[in-house]
Each structure stands twice: as C-alpha cells, then as structure tokens.
C-alpha cells in the first residue's frame, strides 16, 4: 500500500510520477482537489523516514499545529483543516536531534498551545525555519520573547490584504525581536488577488523600509499582468 500525496494542481506542477510495484495506491492532498479522507491516525503520526531523501538528512519536517481561523479566500487551510488552530503533535514526533527543523504550521500563533510548543522548539536548540507565515497580528511582547529563545534560521510573515495596514504590527515585532538580519525576517506579499500595482509596490517598499525582506507571491500566475510578473522577478531576485 502506497500513499501518494500532491500539493499543487496542474497550474504549477504536472502529476507525472508513477508508482510501481504497489498493490494499492491511495492518492490524496490538495493537488487532487478539495475533500478527501483523512489519513489513518497511525499514518498521520508516524515518524517521517528521512532516509528516503538523503540530501535532506539533518533536517526535520513537520507540523505542531493545524488549522487557521482566518478563512482567507485564496487559501484552502481553513476549509481543509478547520477554522481553529489546534495542537496535533509534540516536537518529538518528527524531530530526534536533527540540526534543523522546517516547521510547516499554517498559523502557529493562533494555537492556544503555541507558548508550550515554542518552548519545545527553544529546548531543542535546533535551527528553526518557520516556513509558513506566522500571523503578525497575533504577535505581542510575550510571544516575541518566546520566539527570541528559539534558534531561528528564518521567520516568515504575510501581508496578503492591501486594505489592511499592518505597519504598526511589523514595527512592534522589529522593536522586540532578537532576529537582527532583515534577510531572516521575511514577508510573503500576495499579488494578483484584487490588489493594484500601486498597492503591491506600497507593501514591498514599506516592508523594506521597516527592515523586512518581502517575497512576492502571485495568485494564479498565468492570469497575472506582465507588470506583476516583473515586480515578482525584481523583488524576489
């Protein structure tokens, strides 16, 4: 029995991988569309076999929490995982001494247990990459102090809605964070989702002025105007 997962649809990646030598293949994941059954508990919570990917040995990947209360129209997380952020694992489930941790949680700071989970990350002394956008609106001096105890490789936030001015939230984080390099304070900037070029440029320039490294994300890239694709290339390179 083989479980075959897929993250993206044909817009971004073709489903070209063929599974051989298996009596049964169960396909799932967002790349195959909404819905689908949850994985059995023992599969969901099995420790990843990192030896399948030798070039990534030394790095642990996993979720401590799932779900997000924001229910953004461009994002599938709330519909797929629920509109509450809940703890789903302890760090020991997918980390056993690796030097680096890639954390995949969609909205860790919205989880009621986030302080304890940050404590687990800090105690690991591993280098942590918060790969998904932490919710800048949920940062405060207390949880920023907890984040400061974590050996952080990079922290990612997001400024998706141009109608929402997040400037003061980003200022507060910079004032309290121990992350000194702007290259390690990264912000996803969503474009081609109802925003104008002027609004996109404003967010990029504001973030740079505040000491962040913006990263332009294009919604449905094939439909994006040329100026947006040029902006992405200019900012991300």
What function would you assign to each model-found segment?
Residues 112, 192-197, 215-237:
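Flexible glycine/acidic-rich beta-alpha junction loops that bind and position SAM and/or redox cofactors
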Residues 20-25, 181-183, 212:
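A short helix->loop->beta-strand "cap" motif at the edges of active sites that frequently abuts
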Residues 48-85, 98-105:
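N-terminal pre-triad scaffold of radical SAM enzymes
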Residues 193-210:
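Catalytic cores of alpha/beta
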Residues 10-13, 33-37, 70-71, 81-83, ...:
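Short catalytic/ligand-binding loop motif for oxyanion handling, primarily in non-cytosolic enzymes
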Residues 13-22, 118-119, 144-147, 167-177, ...:
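Generic structural signal for well-ordered alpha-helices
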């Amino acid at each position: 029995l083989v479980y075959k997962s897929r993250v993206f649809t044909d817009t971004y990646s073709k489903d070209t991988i063929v599974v051989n030598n298996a009596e049964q293949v169960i396909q799932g994941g967002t790349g195959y569309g909404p819905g689908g059954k949850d994985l059995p508990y023992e599969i969901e919570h099995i420790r990843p076999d990192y030896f399948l990917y030798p070039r990534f040995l030394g790095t642990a990947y996993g979720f401590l929490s799932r779900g997000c209360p924001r229910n953004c129209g461009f994002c599938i997380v709330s519909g797929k995982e629920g509109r509450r952020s809940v703890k789903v694992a302890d760090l020991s489930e997918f980390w056993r001494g690796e030097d680096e941790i890639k954390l995949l949680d969609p909205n860790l700071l919205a989880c009621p247990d986030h302080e304890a989970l940050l404590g687990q990350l800090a105690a690991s002394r591993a280098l942590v990459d918060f790969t998904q956008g932490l919710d800048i609106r949920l940062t405060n001096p207390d949880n920023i102090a907890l984040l400061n105890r974590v050996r952080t490789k990079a922290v990612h936030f997001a400024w998706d809605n141009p109608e929402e001015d997040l400037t003061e939230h980003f200022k507060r984080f910079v004032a309290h964070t121990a992350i000194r390099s702007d290259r390690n304070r990264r912000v996803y900037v969503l474009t081609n989702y109802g925003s104008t070029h002027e609004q996109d440029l404003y967010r990029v320039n504001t973030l740079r002025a505040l000491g962040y490294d913006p990263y332009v994300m294009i919604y449905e890239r094939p439909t994006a105007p040329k100026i947006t694709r040029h902006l992405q290339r200019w900012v991300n390179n």
